From Swiss-Prot:
Keyword Mitochondrion: no
Keywords noted in UniProt: Amino-acid biosynthesis, Arginine biosynthesis, Cytoplasm, Transferase
The species this protein was found in: Aromatoleum aromaticum (strain DSM 19018 / LMG 30748 / EbN1) (Azoarcus sp. (strain EbN1))
Originating gene: argF
Record field: catalytic activity: carbamoyl phosphate + L-ornithine = L-citrulline + phosphate + H(+)
Similarity comment text for this entry: Belongs to the aspartate/ornithine carbamoyltransferase superfamily. OTCase family.
Annotated compartments: Cytoplasm
Enzyme class: transferase
Annotated positions binding L-ornithine: N163, D221, S225, M226
Superkingdom: Bacteria
Protein name: Ornithine carbamoyltransferase
Role, per record: Reversibly catalyzes the transfer of the carbamoyl group from carbamoyl phosphate (CP) to the N(epsilon) atom of ornithine (ORN) to produce L-citrulline.
SUPFAM superfamilies listed in its UniProt record: Aspartate/ornithine carbamoyltransferase
Length: 307
């Protein structure tokens, strides 16, 4: 049996892989906009395992698999044996014998790595505490749609050094662009983690305005991610000066775009005039989760497909 290919971190793909996935995304999205059916995964099954709740992840994967001609099954850990102590390795053996691709949205990266190691089919990281590769895949494709190649460009990350930030750093090293990160004191990218991504594409700033200077893309996320709710009150104080506003966007390039993976809290990590303004591409970004993930599933299940 051929060993399946997984998508657990952004660095799991090469630059050529991404070139193909982005090309396929463009083609698949065009078919979607023309209401032309495209069913390369007819009679295939996606199993979606959720330990963390979601709106966009479930909707984009479930709708995406149906649009590709397949079916999607939703499992959450509360209603399955995974939530009752069944070993991840055992669950992987069983689930992968009854499906063609698996998407997991969970807390610990170790869980998805262990599942993939015992799976007979491709496994996709729908989100973990450490990485969110599908979101960055959509973000980069959205940038390409609006501004062209991201190579050599600058992304300003303002806020928490969370899973989104980690994945941006991986993407920058692989696709040759720069990331400026600005976080409050105590929330910086840890030195040992920064070393994992190299230093040629990453710079850390104490001042968010400085991070945004000359940026082609300004992006942020909620201040309190799932699993950190106990820290919410403290984080609201610590991050108060890291709200992306019109002044920060003015420091960026005149044609810079704003992104947010959603859900957003207006008045916290971003002001309403920015997220609802002319430079914001958040709705295209959200829609593109659907299209890039269709291209991703096609690639993992079928390999390279040409027009």
């Amino acid at each position: 049996m051929t060993k399946p290919r997984h998508y657990l971190q952004f660095k799991d793909f090469t630059r050529d892989d991404y070139r193909h996935v982005f090309d396929r995304t463009r083609w698949i999205k065009d078919k979607f906009k023309r209401y032309e059916p495209y069913h390369p995964l007819f009679d295939r099954t996606l199993v979606m395992i959720f330990e963390k709740a979601s709106t966009r992840t479930r909707l984009s994967f479930e709708a995406g698999m149906q649009q590709l001609g397949g079916s999607a099954i939703y499992l959450n850990t509360r209603d399955s044996q995974l939530g009752r102590g069944e070993p991840v390795e055992d669950a992987a053996q069983v689930i992968s014998r009854m499906s063609d691709v698996v998407m997991i949205r969970t807390f610990e990266q170790d869980i998805i790595e262990r599942f993939a190691a015992h799976s007979r089919v491709p496994v996709i990281n729908g989100l973990t505490n450490e990485y969110h590769p599908c979101q960055i895949l959509a973000d980069i494709y959205t940038f390409i749609e609006h501004r062209g190649s991201i190579q050599g460009r600058t992304v300003a990350w303002v806020g928490d050094s969370n899973n989104m930030c980690n994945t941006w750093l991986q993407a920058a090293e692989l696709l040759d662009f720069n990331v400026h990160v600005s976080t409050p004191p105590g929330y910086e990218v840890e030195p040992e983690r920064a070393g994992l991504y190299g230093t040629g594409h990453f710079e850390q700033f104490a001042d968010p305005m400085e991070a945004c200077k000359g940026a082609d893309l300004v992006t942020t996320d909620v201040w309190t991610s799932m699993g950190f709710e106990a820290e919410n009150d403290e984080r609201m104080k610590d991050f108060a000066d890291w709200c992306v506003d019109a002044e920060m966007m003015a420091a960026a390039r005149a044609d810079a775009v704003f992104m947010h993976c959603l859900p957003a809290h207006r008045g916290e990590e971003v002001t309403a005039d920015v997220i609802d303004g002319a430079q914001s591409v958040v709705w295209d970004e959200a829609e593109n989760r659907l299209h890039v993930q269709k291209a991703l599933m096609e690639y993992l299940v079928l390999g390279k497909v040409e027009d």
